[in-house]
Amino acid sequence: MARKKKKLKLPLYSSKVSAGFPSPADDFIDKTLDLNDLVIKHPQATFFVRVSGNSMINAGIKDGDILVIDKSLEPVEGKIVIANVDGEFVLKRIRKKGGKLYLYPENSDFNPIEIKEGMECEIWGVVTYVIHTIV
């Protein structure tokens, strides 16, 4: 039996965050926000995974980040996906060139993976959000 999840509503301020001098008049809450509602659009098709490695660093995805993955989304050109290629899980961007399918890293230290006939490749889901700490 599935447990009912308790919502955690946190304040969402209506004012934008200033990169300069903040206005004291912007000190009010517009509404509350539950992060689950924000990042999980399809609960039955969503999972989280922690990143290991730096092949996607130029896409803003760092070692140790947590990814929100949605299995219900179409893995189209340009999307970042989790794929199982010949038994190995990889995090890459989908690209098509000359009628061929590639999984591209976002770090020039790594090579793209060309998906060739006979290879096993299953897309497990599309990355929708990246969660990482900045401190």
Model-found features: residue ranges?
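Residue-level recognition of conserved beta-strand positions in structured domain cores
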Residues: 93-94, 105-106
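Well-ordered alpha/beta subsegment
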Residues: 94-96, 100
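Short, positionally conserved secondary-structure boundary motifs
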Residues: 1-57, 88-89, 100, 111, ...
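Short, hydrophobic/aromatic-rich segments at coil-to-beta transitions
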Residues: 44-46, 76-81
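Structural motif
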Residues: 64-65, 79
